[in-house]
């Protein structure tokens, strides 16, 4: 791969977007790619938006990219997909967790949660929507939702030479390694059903 590829990961604080970016970066580095990563935490500790950008290729000169430049966008919450859609290029792939987190204003009834987030993305982009949060709960730990979603997106990375399951096993803490391997496999399987 000579050209640079870019992935935008978006979610709400505490959902694990940064862990996904670390898994990606570790895998690409092991495969010999030049990798750059950036993180924006915002008000993450208060349920605010979190985004991280990962770029990989033969030579990457900077970690940040602009609107319309992401080849892949991973949204750990479906409203975040719509919020950051302008960063995805027209031929890009959106991988979305079909899950809603209600902000304080929505939970209080002051605002309504927007309808049709996934449908809006499907009109404009190739979209893989999986119930990653539900799958994680079925696996016994809702915190592994991020790895479920990573599994759903890994085939879109276009790097079949990388053993992503092994990278997950090497990146996550040992005490949750088996859970995260199951989460990765479940996410990959869910995405294959969407294709």
Named regions from a protein language model:
Residues 1-195:
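Active-site cofactor/cluster-binding pocket
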């Amino acid at each position: 791969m000579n050209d640079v590829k870019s992935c935008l990961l978006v979610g709400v604080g505490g959902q694990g977007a940064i862990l996904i970016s670390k898994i990606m970066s570790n895998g690409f580095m092991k495969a010999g790619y030049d990798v750059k990563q950036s993180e924006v935490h915002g008000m993450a500790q208060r349920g605010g938006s979190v985004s991280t950008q990962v770029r990989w290729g033969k030579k990457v000169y900077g970690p940040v990219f602009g609107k319309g430049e992401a080849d892949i966008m991973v949204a750990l919450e479906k409203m975040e997909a719509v919020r950051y859609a302008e960063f995805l290029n027209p031929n890009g792939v959106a991988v979305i967790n079909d899950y809603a987190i209600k902000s304080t204003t929505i939970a209080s009834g002051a605002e309504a949660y927007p309808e049709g987030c996934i449908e809006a993305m499907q009109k404009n982009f190739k979209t893989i929507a999986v119930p990653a949060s539900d799958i994680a709960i079925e696996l016994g730990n809702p915190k592994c939702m991020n790895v479920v979603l990573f599994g759903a997106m890994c085939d879109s990375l276009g790097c079949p030479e990388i053993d992503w399951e092994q990278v997950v096993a090497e990146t996550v803490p040992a005490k949750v390694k088996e859970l995260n391997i199951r989460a990765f496999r479940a996410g990959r399987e869910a995405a294959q059903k969407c294709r």
